[in-house]
Amino acid sequence: MESTLGLEIIEVVEQAAIASAKWMGKGEKNTADQVAVEAMRERMNQIHMRGRIVIGEGERDDAPMLYIGEEVGICTREDAKAYCNPEELIEIDIAVDPCEGTNLVAYGQNGSMAVLAISEKGGLFAAPDFYMKKLAAPPAAKGKVDINKSATENLKILGECLERTVEELVVVVMDRPRHKELIQEIRDAGARVRLISDGDVSAAISCGFAGTNIHALMGIGAAPEGVISAAAMRCLGGHFQGQLIYDPEVVKTGLIGESREGNIARLKEMGIDDPDRVYTDSELASGETVLFAACGITPGTLMEGVRFFHGGARTQSLVISSQSKTARFVDTIHIQEQPKYIELK
């Protein structure tokens, strides 16, 4: 799968990032997302595969493109027999976020990117559109920190794993009212907090790389993005745990059902009998082979954002593989018309 699709998925996120970056700073978050969706879908439909969106832009009735259950790839066409040999057919599940951090793009802020994860059919958890409590940490802490422990306990363990004092640790938390007590506990324990407005996928992945000055992600965010983060951390060997949040009193946003009991019933209808289950990265991204790809839209911790020059653009992307145990940073110059010059830096 990696040798066949590795380069292709880089081009998918690159095209989405370039399209979205053209709307950077214009205050139009919906447009920035829409053009990324269109570009990502167009490029995926040029790939020799039969792909199924398991995490996308929403349910079929709510999303015109890249909706959950949509099939993409050349081998989904009506005339697919002319192009696809059944014996060589690659069937994959796909999780996408064409513009992770739409507000960041709209207001010209750092940290947005186009992301996707793929695995063989059945290899990615089809997360409901709920919230998820998340804990991400570096490979050294894998299996040692635990989402059921307090932040104070986890920070002590994390410090020991990284041979740092708690005061030297930086924890990323989304700046939301629901995290007021968590933020205070982290500070009381002695660690430092980096608050972000959006984009916790980037924060989770950054835990897997030394030198980012991000040592953990804690708190509650969207469940679909949790699966994408888990896929990346599975490839990196980092620690990731997620637990679905079904109690509206916890998030206080009105974006999930109004009743706790109703949400539990909805999860049961989706085949989730234990709503309190804690999922590991290997359970959220359980496939034999998992690939993750991201391309910076605006500058971030790991990648530069899209830079335009006359006649083209320059992108920085990341592709991580569970199969080859590699993380490749890809610097690409896109020549779209005869340029006056090529941007080298």
UniProtKB/Swiss-Prot annotation:
It comes from Crocosphaera subtropica (strain ATCC 51142 / BH68). It catalyses: beta-D-fructose 1,6-bisphosphate + H2O = beta-D-fructose 6-phosphate + phosphate; D-sedoheptulose 1,7-bisphosphate + H2O = D-sedoheptulose 7-phosphate + phosphate. GO terms for molecular function: fructose 1,6-bisphosphate 1-phosphatase activity; metal ion binding; sedoheptulose-bisphosphatase activity. Its cofactor is Mn(2+). Pathway: Carbohydrate biosynthesis; Calvin cycle. Mn(2+) 1 binds at residues 33, 57. Homotetramer. The keyword NAD does not apply. Pfam families: FBPase_glpX (PF03320). Substrate binds at residues 100-102, 131, 176-178, 198-200. This is D-fructose 1,6-bisphosphatase class 2/sedoheptulose 1,7-bisphosphatase.
